[in-house]
Amino acid sequence: MKRPSGRAADQLRSIRITRNYTKHAEGSVLVEFGDTKVICTVSVESGVPRFLKGQGQGWLTAEYGMLPRATGERNQREASRGKQGGRTLEIQRLIGRSLRAALDMSKLGENTLYVDCDVIQADGGTRTASITGAMVALIDALKVLKKRGSLKGEPLKQMIAAVSVGIYQGEPVLDLDYLEDSAAETDLNVVMTNAGGFIEVQGTAEGAPFQPEEFNAMLALAQKGMNEIFELQKAALVD
């Protein structure tokens, strides 16, 4: 089996994490997984949703979108259609769930963190790139809150990151690009903590059912890739 990119089965794409990419947000990152590029910002607002008022804890929510020409053909803006699509809603909920798992909300004070992930170029793995980049932007936003004296302690419990794995031409592969993803028999998106715990595993057999041993092989690939991604996050956060 030869991957279209020429990468080994267990090889990540080239990953770059550029901090402070925009001027105004408390945390901002440009994350690049190969040709997939996502701008991730984290904005802080005082106050929490109504269901949390008076409880002394914070909240985090996420939104996800793509530029119309992030893909090979132009897509209509969801705003012009008047509603978000099911895929968009699914992805932004995944991003929010994943990042909330990194935090102790009781230490945030009554502040809301708004995570915005905007795909400027898509070549597969946009949701996993979004989670990975947003984690770094989130840490920068928490530093701002700490300087303001808005925190009630250390809210960061753990780092998180995400990566895709799949079965391509009968073999498990790591970090699928669009050509692989569109032809894969199976596609998994895996979210993990830096302590090795799983937060979420989303999987679909598109071509043929996958066997337990293939599932375990994909998880092992994800763990290997994740270890490398956590090191890249750590390196990006060095001031």
From Swiss-Prot:
Top-tier EC class: transferase
Domain of life (superkingdom): Bacteria
Protein name in UniProt: Ribonuclease PH
Pfam families according to UniProt: RNase_PH (PF01138), RNase_PH_C (PF03725)
GO BP terms in the entry: rRNA catabolic process; rRNA processing; tRNA processing
One GO MF term attached to the UniProt entry: tRNA binding
Subunit structure: Homohexameric ring arranged as a trimer of dimers.
Swiss-Prot/TrEMBL catalytic activity: tRNA(n+1) + phosphate = tRNA(n) + a ribonucleoside 5'-diphosphate
Organism of this sequence: Ectopseudomonas mendocina (strain ymp) (Pseudomonas mendocina)
Positions annotated to bind phosphate: R87, G125, T126, R127
Function text: Phosphorolytic 3'-5' exoribonuclease that plays an important role in tRNA 3'-end maturation. Removes nucleotide residues following the 3'-CCA terminus of tRNAs; can also add nucleotides to the ends of RNA molecules by using nucleoside diphosphates as substrates, but this may not be physiologically important. Probably plays a role in initiation of 16S rRNA degradation (leading to ribosome degradation) during starvation.
Record family assignment: Belongs to the RNase PH family.
Organism lineage: Bacteria, Pseudomonadati, Pseudomonadota, Gammaproteobacteria, Pseudomonadales
Keywords for the protein's UniProt record, in alphabetical order: Nucleotidyltransferase, RNA-binding, rRNA processing, Transferase, tRNA processing, tRNA-binding
InterPro entries registered for this protein in UniProt: ExoRNase_PH_dom1 (IPR001247), ExoRNase_PH_dom2 (IPR015847), ExoRNase_PH_dom2_sf (IPR036345), PNPase/RNase_PH_dom_sf (IPR027408), Ribosomal_Su5_D2-typ_SF (IPR020568), RNase_PH (IPR050080), RNase_PH_bac-type (IPR002381), RNase_PH_CS (IPR018336)
Keyword DNA repair listed: no
PANTHER family linked to this entry: EXOSOME COMPLEX COMPONENT, EXOSOME COMPLEX COMPONENT RRP41
Catalytic activity, EC: 2.7.7.56
